[in-house]
């Protein structure tokens, strides 16, 4: 409540201020906060609001989200002393020894990182080696944010390699030579991009960050497929810029570097979803002489001529249509 009236020297807060700013829209914190800070916050808010009916809220927080913990294996020497991961050396991935005297150590199960158990990673060392973006990407991609995650150096390396691919993709688009344009191919590309942006935007709003990152992996492959297609540089650049804006909450350093590569104003608004560009698709069963030979995903508004063309090049239906005319 005090944060709502920080400059008030006479009172802890004023009614106008707290009624304007409170309640907090979203509270994000670990489970341990639910039994300490949250409990006291609710207690004081309920107590104050009982004695002053002009306060127009009874709960301090509208929504609560509790994130999981980052976990790591624990290590003990034969005397029962806890050891840091940097003090041990793994052999064949099954057992480990103490670096200082080569004695065998006891491997413990993964537990939330703790100073007392020394199962922590030096963040400065990891950031120096891989960058903050790679670490953030790994943590967000490994599992749903409300679940605990198992720390993995291999996972961080993998995240770092993917982010390098994203940079290379942006560079290739910035240096790409213009292709002859096929409007239909371009239309399909724009439609698919609108679907991706819609999914990512929805997942961010629902705290499904791991789902977002899965979409980014799919987006990367999608862009790679269209690099050598008949899509204009303008359309490719416009959409890769939108993708990098979507990546800002996840990997801000890389995203801003890529946006500068495209000479884009990084302060522009969040990408907007043009739902008119999302083409509805239907499943079309291809029957030949009364038997289903294939099932195709096609746009709902295709003409009969366009459908026939798609069917004629279907790998499953082609052998039944060779040297024959399609009647209906």
Listing of model-derived features with the role each one plays in the protein:
Residues 1-174, 189-224, 238-243:
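Structured secondary-structure scaffolds
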Residues 7, 142, 262, 311-315:
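Alpha-helix boundary/capping residues
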Residues 11, 179, 284-328:
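NTP/phosphate- and nucleic-acid-binding module
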Residues 47-48, 126, 246-247, 258, ...:
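Broad structural signal for hydrophobic residues in well-ordered alpha-helices, predominantly aliphatic
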Residues 53, 132, 263-264, 316:
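Short aromatic/hydrophobic-glycine micro-motifs
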Residues 56-59, 255, 324:
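Short secondary-structure junction motifs
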Residues 62, 119, 277-279, 321-323:
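Short solvent-exposed loop/turn micro-motifs enriched in small/polar/acidic residues
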Residues 64-66, 70-89, 178-199, 214, ...:
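Acidic, turn-prone loop/beta-hairpin segments
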């Amino acid at each position: 409540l005090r944060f709502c009236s920080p400059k008030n020297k006479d009172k802890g807060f004023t009614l106008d201020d707290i009624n304007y700013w409170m309640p907090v829209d979203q509270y994000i914190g670990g489970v341990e906060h639910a039994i300490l800070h949250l409990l006291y916050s609710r207690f004081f808010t309920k107590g104050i609001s009982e004695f002053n009916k002009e306060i127009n809220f009874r709960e301090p927080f509208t929504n609560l989200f509790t994130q999981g913990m980052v976990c790591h294996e624990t290590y003990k020497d034969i005397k029962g002393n806890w050891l840091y991961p940097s003090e041990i050396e793994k052999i064949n991935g099954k057992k480990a020894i103490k670096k200082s005297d080569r004695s065998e150590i006891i491997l413990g199960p993964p537990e939330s990182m703790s100073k007392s158990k020394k199962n922590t990673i030096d963040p400065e060392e990891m950031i120096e080696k891989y960058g903050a973006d790679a670490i953030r990407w790994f943590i967000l991609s490994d599992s749903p944010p409300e679940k605990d995650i198992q720390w993995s150096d291999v996972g961080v390396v993998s995240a770092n390699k993917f982010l390098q691919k994203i940079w290379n993709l942006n560079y290739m688009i910035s240096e790409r030579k213009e292709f002859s344009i096929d409007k239909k191919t371009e239309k399909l590309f724009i439609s698919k991009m609108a679907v991706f942006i819609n999914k990512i935007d929805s997942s961010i709003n629902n705290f499904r960050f791991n789902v977002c990152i899965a979409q980014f992996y799919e987006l990367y492959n999608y862009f790679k497929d269209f690099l050598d297609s008949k899509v204009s540089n303008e359309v490719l650049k416009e959409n890769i810029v939108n993708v990098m804006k979507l990546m800002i909450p996840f990997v801000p350093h890389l995203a801003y570097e890529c946006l500068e590569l495209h000479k884009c104003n990084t302060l522009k608004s969040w990408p907007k979803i043009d739902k008119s560009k999302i083409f509805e698709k239907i499943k079309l069963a291809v029957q030949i002489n009364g038997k289903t030979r294939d099932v195709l995903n096609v746009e709902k508004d295709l003409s009969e001529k366009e459908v026939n063309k798609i069917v004629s090049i279907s790998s499953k239906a082609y052998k039944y249509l060779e040297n024959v005319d399609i009647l209906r």
